[in-house]
Amino acid sequence: MNKLELMKTANEVRKGIVTAVHSAKSGHPGGSLSAADIYTYLYFEEMNIDPKDPKKADRDRFVLSKGHTAPGYYSTLAHRGFFPVEDLTTLRKVGSYLQGHPDMKHIPGVDMSSGSLGQGISAAVGMAISAKLSNDDYRVYTLLGDGEIQEGQVWEASMLAGHRKLDNLVVIVDNNNLQIDGKITDVNSPYPIDKKFEAFNFHVINIDGNDFDQIEAAFKEARKTKGVPTAIIAKTIKGKGVSFMEDQAGWHGKAPNDEQYAQAMEELEKAGEALCQK
């Protein structure tokens, strides 16, 4: 995909996020929207995957460590062809396979169940070690929230990743600077994030996580990096793409009402139309 196609796809992913959360009347739109560009690049450009064969042995693995932002993950998987886009409206409903957190047993394309913050990166490190032990060449990607990295388990896993020189592992931090209680700098600041990962022997890349040029360059650089794992610190805007949700901690974990949903979809439709004019 070229940059324009990626931007159009990310806009569709964002529409899916808003639709899913509105339908469920609960969920986490803010962090899903902030990471939509990263999800899109991973699943439509970067990763070796096949929606027709989700469990193929040589596929790249992805672990959503910040599992509460499942709406963004699900919308990406649906638009990539793992399951019908129409199923997004069943989010969190009784009997639906699309529950509030990713479930590897029931959702095509999900490599690891997640939800308890800090655990996803540990699973990703284990997958990367497994690949090394088996001489497999698949790569492992994991997406964390910047509030999540307040968890001590994140740094235990990072210590091991650096020690084992896991150059097949890419850790992405969605650095939107907001969590449910407000700014991460006010709650329990993890800054400087880059220096912490560097201390654990990571190659660190700082980018604008809502800019496809920078996203592409970062993942290409990560592929060229040998002997150490890579951490991509992606500065993003929480709620990106919906004006009244942007940079607002209050949209961490609530659904838009009917009026707000209509406004959000109108904005995203206009954004899509503008992209089609380019």
Where does each model-flagged region fall?
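N-terminal hydrophobic or amphipathic helices/low-complexity stretches enriched
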Residues: 1-13
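N-terminal capping segment at the start of a domain
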Residues: 10-26, 174-176
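Cofactor-binding active-site loop characterized by glycine-rich and histidine/acidic residues
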Residues: 17-21, 32-163
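Glycine-rich beta-alpha junction loops
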Residues: 68-69, 73, 176-177, 211, ...
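Short acidic, glycine/serine/threonine-rich loops at helix termini
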Residues: 74-75, 103, 153-155, 181-185, ...
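Short secondary-structure boundary/capping segments
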Residues: 80, 187, 246-250
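Thiamine diphosphate
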Residues: 109, 113-116, 121-224
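Glycine/aspartate-rich loop-and-adjacent alpha/beta segment that forms the canonical ThDP
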Residues: 212-278
